[in-house]
Amino acid sequence: MNRSKFESVFSEEINQYLDHMLVSGYKERSYYYLLRKFDRFCIEYEICQPIFTHQHAKEWIHRKENEASTTHYARVNGIKQFLIYLNRKGYQIFV
């Protein structure tokens, strides 16, 4: 799969996480789209430092209008795993 370029402050970490998941046997496609949404979210909310605050988390977990509960669950929990990954690497991340 050809990856589009991620553009947020977390772009390098997103690519490393995708590589890690591929090596672990997961399919890139299942994570790519969620991480792309997260990348856009970070740009939209002008996250310029590699820090994810409580306020950012509140905005991310807010259920979108017309978002199915299963889609909401997948979006929130898929990115939660990425945030845990960042937290373990020493980033200031609210999980």
Q: Which residues does each PLM region occupy?
A:
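Extended non-catalytic domains of envelope/secretory-pathway proteins
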Residues: F10-E12
